[in-house]
Structures are given as C-alpha cells and as structure tokens.
C-alpha cells in the first residue's frame, strides 16, 4: 500500500526504522485500548460466578493486547489517509517512525498471541469472540466499511461493543441476554459519539474521501440520526435495571445520564448548519465518553454493592 509522508521522512518497507517503545505503544491506540479494557473489566465484574484473580488478570491483558493489535492493523492500513488528516498525521507510520511492514507484523503477532493465550488460559469461547472482534475491526470495518459507506461506524461499531461480552464469557463461558445488553449499550452509543466527531472534522474526512455521514448526507440528516441514537442509547442504558441484573438505584442513575445525553444531542440538532465552531458537537463528543464510563462504573458499583449486601446481610 502507498503511504503518504508529510515530512519527507517515510520509513520504507524493508528498511529498519528507528522506532522507540513509545512509538510502538502509540501504534496500539492506548486511548481506545483504555476504553476496551474498562468495559471488558466491567463484563468480568458483572458476570455471575467467579474467576480466579490471576486468570482474570490474564484475561484483561489478553483483551488489551488484542485491542492494541487491531489498532496497529488499523494504523497500518490507514497510513495513507492518516498522513493527510491533521489529527492523525503525527502517528508513527505517516510520520516515518515505523515502517508499514513492521506495523503489520507487530499487529499480526499480537493478534495471534492474545487469542491463543486467552483460549489456553481461560476458555475458547472468549478467545473466539476476541478473534472475531480483531477480524471485524481490522478487516470488515477498516478495510471494507470505512471507505465504502456512510454507515461505516454503525456497523463497524460492533467491534468496540464486544469487550464486555468477552469479559462476561471469560467468567461464564457463555453469551447471555445480559451480556448482549452490555454489547448493545456500546453499539448504540457509537454512532452519536463518532458522528459528533465527524461533524467538527468534516473537512478532514472530505479531504481523504472517507464517506462519513455528514459529508454524504449533510449536517441536518446527521443531527437527526444523532438524536435518534442518543435516545436509543439512553433507553438501552436502563435495561439492566428492568432485566434484573442491576438495581432500581442504578436505573435512576442511568436515566439521569441518558437524559443529559439526549439533551446534548438536541443541542447539536439545534445547532445551525454550517456553524464553524461546532461547540455543541464538541460538547456532545466529550460527554459521550463520560457517559459510557459513568454507566459502566455505575453498573460495577451496583454489582459490588449487591455482593456486599448478600454477604453481610445489610449495610449495618
């Protein structure tokens, strides 16, 4: 594949780069990895049953490595457009610090390592879901959907929604309605989150030909879709309470967070088309990250509280 270099310092295939450990760590997309690790850990905590702490740690490390591997493969394939977009031009490959072939090998080795170790140490169901997640993100989303359809992140968002299901499967060796709800919370959250970003990064996406919804369908359609997905996310966020694997108290917290999420999305909907500052979109993007962390934190706190009460007979 062709890699564009804005700095004239492209590291060519076949040549050893002078990459640092920090460059390879950046290749793993640590910010994305942190969200993956957090939601996978939530799946471990929320699942009924017990997993040995050592196996739990191994599971989380394998999921983190698998997420990092898919990030490396994504950066390898997207290096040509990363070089053009302002927010990605300084990534290791387009900046010439890591050769594309090194990034590809790094991602493939980590992918295989994470899946095999998770299967051998924990169970093969969780390893299979992890393998499918890596494939879905690196191949289905990155190589196919991202550059071919404005629904790229709607379908591709499934890759980011699997971690809590993997964590759940590590404990139970099963996929259940409860773990599917955890999947759906992230799956439905993804469009509003990324389309908010796409609104204030429209020019970048247009420059590289990635058909994000605002560029293809326009701002107004995108804003309608953001509100719709925010509502769906808020509704799905309270389902754990209705399905009985979270308390009424959690439901109130989730409802409040969902109401704020919807409010922020409506602020984006009311934003005039062509607004250059895009402040409501930036606020929604920031709050959406907080929302996801807050919902899964509330679920874990609720679960730990119920375990405490069941073991002690009450708070006092």
Swiss-Prot record:
Gene Ontology CC annotations of this record: plasma membrane
Domain of life the protein comes from: Bacteria
Gene3D superfamilies, sorted: UbiA prenyltransferase
Key words, A-Z: Cell inner membrane, Cell membrane, Heme biosynthesis, Membrane, Transferase, Transmembrane, Transmembrane helix
InterPro entries given in the database record: Protohaem_IX_farnesylTrfase, UbiA_prenyltransferase, UbiA_prenylTrfase_CS, UbiA_sf
GO biological process, one term: heme O biosynthetic process
Major location (coarse): membrane
Subcellular location: Cell inner membrane
Catalytic activity: heme b + (2E,6E)-farnesyl diphosphate + H2O = Fe(II)-heme o + diphosphate
Transmembrane segments: 32-52, 53-73, 93-113, 116-136, 152-172, 180-200, 221-241, 252-271, 289-309
The keyword GTP-binding appears for this protein: no
Protein's job: Converts heme B (protoheme IX) to heme O by substitution of the vinyl group on carbon 2 of heme B porphyrin ring with a hydroxyethyl farnesyl side group.
Further remarks about this protein from its record: Carbon 2 of the heme B porphyrin ring is defined according to the Fischer nomenclature.
Family: Belongs to the UbiA prenyltransferase family. Protoheme IX farnesyltransferase subfamily.
Protein's name in the database: Protoheme IX farnesyltransferase
Species annotation: Rhizobium leguminosarum bv. trifolii (strain WSM2304)
